[in-house]
Amino acid sequence: MRKLLCSALLLAAAFAGRAQDPNFSQFFASPLTLNPALTGKFDGDFRVAGNYRNQWPTINNAFTTATVSFDIGLLKDRIPEFDQFGLGVMAFSDKSGNGVLQNNFAALSLSYHKALDENGFNQLGLGFQGTYSNKRLDITKVVFLDQLTANGFTGITNEIFSQNQLNVSYLDVNAGILYNGTTDGSNNFYLGASMYHINRPKESFQGGQYYLDPRLTIQAGGMLPRGEFDAIHFSAIHSRQANAVNTVIGGAYMLNLNADPENPTNLYMGSWFRLGDAIIPYVGLEFNSFHLGFTYDANMSSLKPASNMRGGAEISLVYIKRPVDPNRRKLNCPRF
């Protein structure tokens, strides 16, 4: 193995960090990274979602992650009334060590949800996703052990590379299943599972034999109305990839500020918890078909001294184009 030093952070990102995919605290606002079966699973004409996360900003922008997705329901006049057929595309970028290591993804997703009863109150769906991935290591930003002198890392390295950037690309296959239900049309609950890296693609800069471990994620949640203009939303995920485990659970209280159920302005306040790691306060605002969310991770783990309890900020924005027909029957979908 080459005498790569980088720093403790970069080593964790480029090597040990391989064991875990990038993830969002607002997982519920990033549907196509959570479960391919969520593709097209919304009540509207189309959906656009964007997410940005800056993790551990006090440690030289350790990790920045951004994604944008677009999905749409297809063949609505050719399939049964409460079935849903979805198509989606997604772009995803993740940078580690202030841009030393970059991961870029482009994905195409398909899903189909079958109504299990005549009212569409219970549905079961499957989703599949194909992803093109590229990982790049910028050698010009890397520090080697033989550059260490009495004055710091000021020497010239003897390491030789044929190019300033090392690249590896591969194709990835992901899939998911989702159950979605309601007891009377006003509440909602869902349970799903997704598997990423099913084909275990090879990922190595120098011809090694490193293969991505599959990531299994189980997700669940629901919405319970308390009155005409307020409700409780709750959700949780548990994911495992090799030895990396991530469990997040929490909820938010929603209040309709304008007392208008058809064109609401909703305020969300709550918190999620990443077990063994962080408290994640959440504030959200829903208006004119937009849903804006903001979280801030407060580290409570062993990283607390290094991060000064500043785990990172995250923002999400989701837009759903609502149908113009006021008399249509609403579709039963997860309500995040």
Describe every region a protein language model picked out.
Residues 20-336:
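Subset of outer-membrane beta-barrel
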Residues 4-13:
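Sec-dependent N-terminal signal peptides
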Residues 15-19:
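Sec/Tat signal peptide C-region and signal peptidase I cleavage site
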